[in-house]
């Protein structure tokens, strides 16, 4: 298992209280494949450096994950298919 940090920028029209539960549905992919969610940190609504899909703000969430590369690729694919997700970025930690 490798350690990853996933940053997700969500549509600012979403209610911030529902961000963590909605992300949890995607994170079930990691749990089903034997991975572990170390931390979910919702930063809230922040201004973007440049517009993404005509949005100047986004709701940021940072998630620390321990999983296999295939599991993280599947998670990133599923997040990319969701219309409320503006952008994702996956980084591998060297712990």
Swiss-Prot record:
<comment type="function">
    <text>Binds together with bS18 to 16S ribosomal RNA.</text>
</comment>
<keyword id="KW-0689">Ribosomal protein</keyword>
<dbReference type="GO" id="GO:0005737">
    <property type="term" value="C:cytoplasm"/>
</dbReference>
<dbReference type="GO" id="GO:0006412">
    <property type="term" value="P:translation"/>
</dbReference>
<comment type="similarity">
    <text>Belongs to the bacterial ribosomal protein bS6 family.</text>
</comment>
<dbReference type="GO" id="GO:1990904">
    <property type="term" value="C:ribonucleoprotein complex"/>
</dbReference>
<dbReference type="GO" id="GO:0070181">
    <property type="term" value="F:small ribosomal subunit rRNA binding"/>
</dbReference>
<protein>
    <recommendedName>
        <fullName>Small ribosomal subunit protein bS6</fullName>
    </recommendedName>
</protein>
<dbReference type="GO" id="GO:0005840">
    <property type="term" value="C:ribosome"/>
</dbReference>
<keyword id="KW-0687">Ribonucleoprotein</keyword>
<dbReference type="Pfam" id="PF01250">
    <property type="entry name" value="Ribosomal_S6"/>
</dbReference>
<keyword id="KW-0694">RNA-binding</keyword>
<keyword id="KW-0699">rRNA-binding</keyword>
<dbReference type="InterPro" id="IPR014717">
    <property type="entry name" value="Transl_elong_EF1B/ribsomal_bS6"/>
</dbReference>
<dbReference type="InterPro" id="IPR035980">
    <property type="entry name" value="Ribosomal_bS6_sf"/>
</dbReference>
<dbReference type="InterPro" id="IPR000529">
    <property type="entry name" value="Ribosomal_bS6"/>
</dbReference>
<dbReference type="GO" id="GO:0003735">
    <property type="term" value="F:structural constituent of ribosome"/>
</dbReference>
<dbReference type="InterPro" id="IPR020814">
    <property type="entry name" value="Ribosomal_S6_plastid/chlpt"/>
</dbReference>
């Amino acid at each position: 298992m490798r350690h990853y940090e996933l940053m997700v920028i969500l549509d600012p029209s979403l209610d911030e209280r529902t961000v963590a539960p909605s992300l949890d549905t995607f994170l079930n992919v990691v749990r089903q494949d034997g991975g572990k969610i170390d931390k979910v940190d919702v930063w809230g609504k922040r201004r973007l450096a440049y517009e993404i899909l005509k949005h100047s703000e986004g709701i940021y969430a940072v998630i620390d994950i321990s999983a296999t590369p295939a599991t993280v690729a599947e998670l990133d694919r599923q997040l990319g298919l969701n219309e409320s997700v503006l952008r994702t970025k996956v980084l591998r930690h060297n712990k």
